[in-house]
Amino acid sequence: MKIISSNRPIFKLILFAILLFFSGLIPSNPSKSHTMNSIISHEKHSLLLWELQYLPQKFFYSISEFIFPFENKKVSKKDPIEIIQNYIKINDQIRKHNNEYEYATIKGNDFKSNAEKEKIIQKYIDELEENQLITENALEEIISNTIQEFDISIFPNTIFPPVLISIEPPPSLLILSPRDEIKLEKTILLKSDNSIPQRYKIEGTIESLENKSALISDIGGLSTYPATVKVRSLESTHSTTAHEWFHNYMIFKPLGRSYFNNDKLRTINETAANIFGDEIAKYILDIQQNNNSKSPTSEPCKKPDFCFGLEMNETRTTVEEYLDQGNISKAEKYMEDRQKLFLDEGYIIRKLNQAYFAFHGIYADSPSSKSTVFEELTYLRNQSNSLADFIKKIENLSNENDYQKLVK
């Protein structure tokens, strides 16, 4: 794919003022409980403070490219994919050490990091910070270029809203659900740097005082403006960047503005964003590989292989059966046992409870979901002439009745 520059620094910065009012498609609802506020008051993530701290970096980097293009000539000649892959390699080293720590903590081991390892991790973190802005620029360029090829925008021949991202670690998310049913009752953004022991402490305190199911989870991205994107694999990073842009785009459409109306519309938004992000990412990957190799597709598990999707779906079904019977303690004991099973099979799930299923269930393509939205939207996408045609069909939805008419 030919990479062309579609970044317009000044335009992006002006648009920021507009989109700031709509930032954050994941709700950060104020708690009615004074007790809960006192528990999490020092851990809350402030979107406004983050914007004020981060925007100047983005502003000066964009201005420097605009005013002093020759200063960045050597960097600009680099392949954007190469820039992103280099960042991913550094990030993978940090994730490797963090995973070792998380696994040891979940298993209850006494994990003490030595000073030498901390120095190594800090070295990688410093490298990430040095490469952050150029990597963001590369991602914005690639995704903008691809969206333009798909002819998706509010205005003709213009990417609107412009793709603008931050690859700083997204905030974590406190998720609350009733114990007697799986329901996304409340979500609150927390700081990204809370430790695993801190998470257990906050969750335990809330569960005992509020009688709720609580979970603090990492998230893949947040549709602020700039959107926050968690860097993982190349395909995943492209997918998440496109996913968050989809939310920014939908802010200007009835579907996006209906996000909080009910759980069904939220699921439609998130699932459509996943379909969009995955298709954009696959297209980029196919171009990069010159169509010489096919993207791996998921196949049904063969016994005696452990199939995460099937096992998680079975877990969700069984938990709901217990809860429908009013047997909360049995459901919670079952989830504890299943969490240990997943951990033994190499899937690092720190905590499996009602809040876990309430959050992951809004993504209908997740094995944690019981929704039919993914199958319905996938069928609609397959019946559409193009990705742009698919988006035009769904962007004006604002209620469940219109959705049902569309997918019939």
Specify the residue positions occupied by each region the protein language model found:
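Pan-zinc metallopeptidase signature
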Residues: 303-408
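N-terminal low-structure segments adjacent to metalloprotease catalytic domains
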Residues: 1-150, 384-408
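Generic, low-specificity signal for short hydrophobic/alpha-helical stretches with a mild N-terminal bias
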Residues: 72, 76-79, 184, 223-227, ...
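Solvent-exposed, acidic/flexible segments
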Residues: 80-83, 87, 230-239, 266-270, ...
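Sequence-level detector for tyrosine residue identity
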Residues: 54, 61, 87, 101-103, ...
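Alpha-helix initiation/capping motif
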Residues: 58, 76, 193-195, 233, ...
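Acidic/His-rich structured neighborhood in mature extracellular/periplasmic domains
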Residues: 93, 102-298
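Charged, low-complexity, helix-prone segments enriched in Lys/Glu/Asp/Gln
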Residues: 2-4, 9-12, 127, 138, ...
